[in-house]
Amino acid sequence: MSENNSIAPQYEVVVIGAGIGGICAGVKLQEIGIDDFLIVDRVGGLGGTWYSHSYPDAGCDIPSTTYQFSFARKPDWDRLFAKRDQILEYLREVAADHDLPRRMRFHTTIVREEWDDRDALWRLHVDSGEVITARFVISAVGAYINAKTTPDIPGLACYAGVSMHPAAWNHDYDFTGKRVAIIGVGASTMQIAPKLAGQVERLDIYQRTPQVYLPKPDFVLRPWMQRMLALPGGSAIVNGLAQGVIDSALRVAVFTPAPLWRLGARLVDALGRSAYAGWVRIKVQNKEIRKQLRPDFGIVCIRGGAGGDYLPTLNRDNVELITAGIGEITPHSIRSADGVEREIDALVLATGYEVFSDPESYKPGTVLGRDGFDLGVFYNTEELKAYYSTSVAGVPNRFIMIGPYSWTGTAFHYFVENAMRHIATVIEETRRRGATVVEVRPQAQERFHQEMLRSGRNLSYYLETRCAGSNSYFINSQGKSPYLRPWSLLKTYRKATRFDREDYSYRGPARRDDPVDAPDIELAAAELS
């Protein structure tokens, strides 16, 4: 206990989440000399999405050559689009190479995070009743935070058959000869449906909004290809080319004058829909099904998936695409809105996720910062904002790896590495100054937010106006699109560490008989208005 009677935390850093973000956090913390950290996860092993999602044919719809850390290149992927088991094996290897497993705890669900300003630490309340204390907290819970396992469908609670979500697949259930319904037509269904169709008696697929299913040029990576990727810089060059394509598209979106952008958006949407209709015509035989598959919005409004087998699956006699909507679920059937009732033995709820750009992902009462600041209340009443997508005023010593306006690059790894470079720089600066508390200044947070709005005007127009009605997760319930970072990849990379250190305030723990000297959030907001 120090002279101001503050207590020492159990850990310098606790990382919440042991997926791609948590592994990256552990590696980068060691690089700045921090070994006193703990990584916790609510499930039974590391890997995040790739641990939880073990449904049939689960795999990546991004080329494997780009789906990896820059500090752990893997040249020997089995195929261009890796399957779940090899991705999970890769993550385990990276974690083991950096001695992370001994710093991990599983089956540990944090239900509430409370900041103690007097002791300058976080108290993390576990569902078991345990309390873990940490100087710093890094939230690495991923982009797809909570599976929507109980969608608002009439009668769902009364269903008496077998049901499951792609994030919690029941491997003990034998689908052979069964009547199965899948609700939802996103990326999971794109992979699940072709596998189930060959087993089941009948497969009903319920579609609310048409999705986009792109060609998937998958193939086995031959030994000579793997040798090429293993050459010095081989994987980096291939990844750089892919990043260049993404970067070019971002630059066009950000720098095109608004009138030209709006004209171009209409043209691109029309051409895209026409090209996609041609692709569907090649793959799907039935004219009525083709009509049901064609979106009436631009094909880039939603995150299309690379799923070469899904469209041909709709040609099977035992597969039916149902677009009438769901009227009611009974104990043993689904009645569609047109009155047709179809009996089922099993139900797959591929109904999506709460994502990081949804205010609903941040539950009130779960993250309580300085002076009672409630992150959930803030994000559910204000626009989502965070300085460099990682730091929120009123929440000292806590960082978000996947926050508002964070998504950039070809894959998840790119932007979590950049987020962690920023976080590590802030923690390192705090320790260098001999401080124990760091908090972003409200003025800096608002300045960054306004830059996101200004730089992202073209993207916002497209997503929030032209994509209305697409049910895209790029657009949240507030009608905003705080998903993509409207910067070039180079700017994102450079700015991660090249920022004004005075955008943060630094101090020690408050003395027990002194008032806390911290930024005034409301005053700063008023000054900026």
Write out the residue ranges for each language-model feature.
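Short beta-strand to alpha-helix junction loop
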Residues: 74-93, 264-270, 297-309
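A conserved short coil-to-beta-strand element within the FAD-binding core of flavoproteins
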Residues: 106-121, 319-337
